[in-house]
Design a protein with these regions (language model features):
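Conserved ATP-binding subdomain of kinase catalytic cores across diverse folds
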Residues: 1-174, 179-255
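Conserved substrate/cofactor phosphate-moiety recognition/catalytic segment
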Residues: 317-374, 416
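Hydrophobic positions on the alpha1 helix immediately C-terminal to the Walker A/P-loop
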Residues: 312, 316
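ATP/Mg2+ or Mg2+-diphosphate-binding catalytic cores
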Residues: 258-301
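Pre-Walker A (Motif I) flank of P-loop NTPase domains
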Residues: 169, 293-299, 372-374
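A glycine- and Lys/Arg-enriched "phosphate-lid" helix/loop adjacent to the NTP-binding pocket
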Residues: 336, 343-353, 396-425
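Conserved lysine of the Walker
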Residues: 309
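The conserved Walker
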Residues: 304-305
Length: 425
């Protein structure tokens, strides 16, 4: 595999010594996620009479990466087309990536690329470079919406991005993790990482993962995109990934769109038609992601008392860095929590009139938070249909995402927990 003597601003292969260096980098970096594929580098020599060889005498005129060729049929894209992908393979891929990032290189220089101001710089660079195409290649309304909500999301979630830096999610990653570069032969073999510019490889693990997530959807397989992200989040114990994955997926769709837009002016008419279709598809994808992450989410954590509802709500609030309002806290703040002893469900502070007042306050807090553009968790039993319908209306009125999450457990556990509560009151 040769490197052309070119200069493109973000890469410089003009000198033979540079091409040798980046051949070496390509081998070392790609051996992290592949086995027995990258064999090393070879010298290409030229004799005085103009003959070229990989071995023998003569002066070195070029360097190349020596690789073992992978069968096309083992590629993720081919397997998807054949319907040959299964949950076990995707789980293995997710676990491979989780192990890769866990053991990946990290230092202050790498952490720098996860900072919200640097994420913003990279995002704005894409926007600036694509501005000349707005109104011709790019639909203006969709583009302006995408730019606006991307900036707003980053501004509202700076604490999430900063927290991911502190918690070690910024790594020396792959940089070009898409279906074309993933093989199963027999296990995951991931090739063609970016070796020519560290800036394109350093970042949140979510930036890498979002590329494959976006690519799987672009190829018409949203079910595998969701499965892969779910499997990774579980393997890496990174539920906060869900907060940023759509944002980064939109970013990756814009990067792919940009590549096609740059190629468009010099392409032949037939090729331009294909490129325009791809550009439209990537913009639509980014637009759809923006609709998702651009809207706050109303989380309804519901379930019977003693099913672990508040524990889950508190953990979710911490992971997603969003505010939580609890019916129990509102009852206590209103002075209707009883005399300190456990009150039976449906009695005392749980009576209908008090319950309605508490739910009215709970939904009012939710309304204020959502209207300010922030997601919120409402933690209460929500056992009555009327209360659930009011939550649905709130989400519909403010055009927010709505997620109901119910906690359940067996009756024996509930009784045991209630008994323990009574004993400690």
């Amino acid at each position: 595999k040769l490197k052309k003597p070119v200069y493109l601003g973000f890469l410089d292969f003009r000198q033979l010594s540079q091409r040798k260096h980046f051949c070496e980098q390509e081998v070392v970096l790609n051996q992290r996620l592949s086995h027995d594929i990258y064999q090393g580098i070879v010298e290409i020599r030229e004799t005085d009479d103009g003959h070229f060889s990989l071995q023998g005498s003569g002066r070195v005129v070029e360097y190349a990466v020596k690789m073992r060729q992978l069968p096309d049929a083992a590629g993720l894209k081919a397997l998807l087309q054949e319907g040959a992908i299964d949950p076990k393979r995707m789980e293995t891929l997710a676990h491979t990536m989780a192990d890769f990032y866990k053991g990946g290189h990290r230092n202050s220089d790498i952490d720098y690329f996860g900072r919200p101001d640097i994420v913003s710089y990279n995002m704005e660079e894409n926007f600036r470079q694509l501005d000349p195409y707005v109104g011709s290649l790019l639909d203006q309304e969709k583009w302006e919406f995408l730019c606006q909500v991307s900036r707003t999301f980053l501004d509202h979630h700076r604490d999430v991005f900063e927290r991911r830096v502190r918690e070690g999610h910024i790594r020396d990653g792959h940089g070009d993790l898409r279906a074309d570069h993933v093989y199963f032969h027999p296990g995951p073999q991931i090739i063609d990482c970016i070796e020519f510019n560290d800036r394109f490889r350093y970042g949140d693990a979510a930036v890498d993962l979002a590329f494959l997530y976006m690519d799987l959807e672009h190829l018409g397989h949203p079910e595998w995109a969701r499965f892969f992200i779910s499997a990774y989040a579980g393997a890496a114990q990174d539920p906060q990934l869900y907060t940023v994955i759509d944002f980064y997926a939109a970013y990756r769709a814009v990067v792919r769109l940009k590549v096609d837009a740059f190629r468009y002016p010099d392409a032949q008419p037939a090729a331009q038609e294909t490129l325009k279709q791809d550009i439209d598809a990537y913009l639509q994808q980014a637009y759809r992601y923006a609709i998702q992450f651009g809207r706050p989410t109303l989380w309804i954590l519901c379930g019977l008392p003693a099913t672990g509802k508040s524990l889950v709500a508190e953990a979710l609030s911490d992971v997603l860095s969003i505010e939580r309002f609890s019916s129990d806290r509102l009852r206590k703040a209103a002075g209707i929590s009883g005399n300190g002893r456990r009150t039976a469900f449906g009695q005392g502070a749980y009576r209908m009139e008090w319950r309605q007042k508490v739910y009215t306050q709970l939904l009012a807090h939710g309304h204020e938070t959502l209207k300010a553009g922030h997601s919120v968790i409402l933690d209460a039993t929500f056992s009555r249909r009327k209360c659930r319908d009011e939550a649905r209306r709130l989400a519909a009125d403010l055009d927010t995402n709505l997620i109901f999450a119910e906690t359940v457990c067996n009756e024996e556990t509930i009784r045991s927990r209630l008994k323990n509560r009574e004993g400690t009151s």
